[in-house]
Design a protein with these regions (language model features):
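Bacterial N-terminal signal peptides that target proteins for export
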Residues: 2-13
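A conserved helix-loop-strand patch within extracytoplasmic ligand-binding domains
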Residues: 115-154
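Sec/Tat signal peptide C-region and signal peptidase I cleavage site
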Residues: 22-28
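Bacterial N-terminal signal peptides
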Residues: 12-21
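Secondary-structure junction motif
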Residues: 157-166
Length: 208
């Protein structure tokens, strides 16, 4: 209960900070109406966003409504928010995708178009393989890639996504970047394909 109270306090501060970040003319009794929170992805991001919106709604006394705006690795949601009024009533459940969408040319603006108001969670992508492969280390995977003379199929969220960039860096360091075929599955689908044996490995967020 103590941790819950601390979290609620942090979220209240975060929402208040959004007021000062997005609007120079907002009133002290903010919010006077519902706040719309853009959610860019499904999976873990959506789960956390739903919990966060419930807590914020309770603390602020106004509905904080999560709205899914998926697509383009986050580009759809970021573009919407960037054009919305800077009055504190439009916020986004952000992620590192703001960097990848900019550098892959999907949006003409970068993270400086927004001001972060709170860090709620952190998550690191995980590389997983089907246990039937018998691989238990990166060395095992490297040996398999070099031995079969073919390509390894690796599931990612999408081309240019953070999972794609992470896996590219890993496989480059392993010396097998030329033996990888990337398959884009969107949010949370790669682990299912991995368990079904249709791909050799997947890089996804642990929550998925």
């Amino acid at each position: 209960m103590k941790n819950s109270s601390k979290l609620k306090g942090l979220l209240t501060v975060a929402a208040t900070a959004a007021l000062f970040t997005f609007s120079g003319t907002a009133k002290a009794d903010y919010p006077e109406k519902s706040v719309e929170m853009t959610v860019l992805f499904g999976g873990t991001a959506n789960t956390i966003a739903q919990i966060l919106s419930d807590l914020l709604s309770e603390e602020l006394g106004q509905p904080v409504v999560p709205v899914a705006r998926k697509g383009g690795g986050g580009a759809v949601g970021y573009t919407y928010l960037q054009s919305a009024a800077a009055d504190g009533y439009s916020i986004v459940w952000n992620s590192n995708s703001i960097n990848t969408t900019y550098h892959t040319g999907r949006i003409p603006f970068d993270h400086t178009a927004f001001t972060p108001i709170a860090r709620i969670s952190t998550e690191i992508p995980a590389l997983a393989v089907n246990s039937s492969t018998g691989w238990s280390s990166l060395a095992d995977m490297t040996a398999a890639a070099n031995a079969n003379g073919g390509k390894l199929k690796v599931g990612i969220s999408g081309k240019g996504s953070f999972t794609h960039l992470t896996s590219a860096a890993i496989f480059d360091a392993m010396g097998i970047s030329d033996k990888i075929i990337y398959i884009s599955y969107g949010s949370g689908k790669a682990p299912i394909e991995l368990l079904a044996g249709r791909i050799d490995a997947a890089i996804q967020w642990p929550g998925q």
